[in-house]
UniProtKB/Swiss-Prot annotation:
Family matches, as Pfam families: Death, Pkinase
Compartment(s) of residence: Cytoplasm; Nucleus
GO cellular-component term (any): cytoplasm
InterPro entries referenced in this protein's UniProt entry, alphabetically: DEATH-like_dom_sf, Death_dom, IRAK3_death, IRAK3_PK, Kinase-like_dom_sf, Prot_kinase_dom
Official protein name in the record: Interleukin-1 receptor-associated kinase 3
Amino acid sequence: MAGRCGARGALSPQLLLFDLPPALLGELCGILDSCDGPLGWRGLAERLSNSWLDVRHIEKYVNQGKSGTRELLWSWAQKNKTIGDLLEVLQDMGHQRAIHLIINYGVSWTPSVQTHHELPFPSFPPEVKHACRENDPGPLEPANVTVDNVLVPEHNEKGTLQKTPISFQSILEGTKHFHKDFLIGEGEIFEVYRVDIRNQAYAVKLFKQEKKMQLKKHWKRFLSELEVLLLFRHPHILELAAYFTETEKLCLVYPYMSNGTLFDRLQCTNGTTPLSWHVRISVLIGIAKAIQYLHNTQPCAVICGNVSSANILLDDQLQPKLTDFAAAHFRPNLEQQSSTINMTGGGRKHLWYMPEEYIRQGRLSVKTDVYSFGIVIMEVLTGCKVVLDDPKHVQLRDLLMELMEKRGLDSCLSFLDRKIPPCPRNFSAKLFSLAGRCVATKAKLRPTMDEVLSSLESTQPSLYFAEDPPTSLKSFRCPSPLFLDNVPSIPVEDDENQNNHSVPPKEVLGTDRVTQKTPFECSQSEVTFLGLDRNRGNRGSEADCNVPSSSHEECWSPELVAPSQDLSPTVISLGSSWEVPGHSYGSKPMEKRCSSGLFCSEHEQSKKQ
């Protein structure tokens, strides 16, 4: 960034970053590199980088002793950014020292202080047209939008509009100016209060505004959620009662859900009753319908981007309601298309519901919601949290997927929620299989929400059958020795060809051999023994040629298996068919070759006897 305008007083906010004076650039990099946290180069990277992968590259430069700020500004300058753009970013960071440094170099710049009254409010069309689905109650006609005090009209049975009795003053009086005693929930950027207005309970979602520089960021997320709730209506999407932008307060008003979140009911928070399997599958189907409806809206699909068990509310009839659309995005209905977004440093807990392509590259698509919904299915089946407490720092998804790959689908059945009576195996196996496909590592391997909903609806009837239909053994895998803990015992097939049958010691082949319960076994193949002592003569040969008719009649002598002085082996050649008394394997006699060169057959021995 060689400076062609090095004289002070000659700098303009429209000056490109490539023309930034080297002295000013060096001092600016020194200030940002010396700071840690949000005022350092990391805080600058959160606003200039497209994904966390770019931040990782900058970290490598920093580890090599280079300036992270210089690398960031160099990459950003290639987008034709100006000094004025840099000052806007520094103002958003709240870095007054860096701002004063640039201004002291002669840059005439007036900071733009905007409030929410000056920000453009979205203009909604008089009539919103979208694809009418089976459960779609019809298009919603948004009310006239103003900035000071906006009320969202409700719909009666005929679909006409009627005003609500909610006012911002009634909310202030009902919550005593948002006192902590009425706080019932809290998120990353909002707080939830309960208020009773005219014998009706409501939940007020108040966006946090601790600093003025956060207002712009929260305003965008406020508009994102507001736009989704105004444009789209569904029985399983939480309806909006009212919203306000009053005295720098951004709040959304919803009907109060008495049964709380799905996460709290699965964890039985405050001693609540566990949900039955019938309720759980009904909740999954309802949320799948809501997500599928948003994915198929026209002309743009809606990506929720924040599907989790904590964002699923249950009403007094245990009907699910999907909520929290602050991270929603609109994109054209192209099946193979995905978009890249800027990630924020917050929401780390929700990252457990996000796939790898979002965490690494910030890629967002409809398959992102499918992945998050698959995690919710695993929570519903097991009743566990996304990150298990014991063992620590183990994700539920990784544990179940590893079990499926190592031991098969049936190994996951031991993790079913034990707080309620067990469900049929066929029902749980189908849900585990569906969850495994939803949380596949590659996005192209995940099903669409249409396929997920169809699979859930076809699985629901199997819950009402007490007996499971017969299944093939091919679906049952042999376990790995590394995964034999806390899982039902599974028979392991043993290959006799891999067993090395060595000569037993004398202590084992002595008198204890008669009382041994497990007989020795050998395959019908060529068997080689060490040569017997030639000094035994014919007596040893005759004894060796006798084949015991039963394992209980065997009487082994230690001397019979003692190795001879020469190393020539004694080979017993078994024909393709031979017969043992009491067993009919064939009629061909067995021939034995002894170390002394004598040949004898079973037939000849019978004649001698």
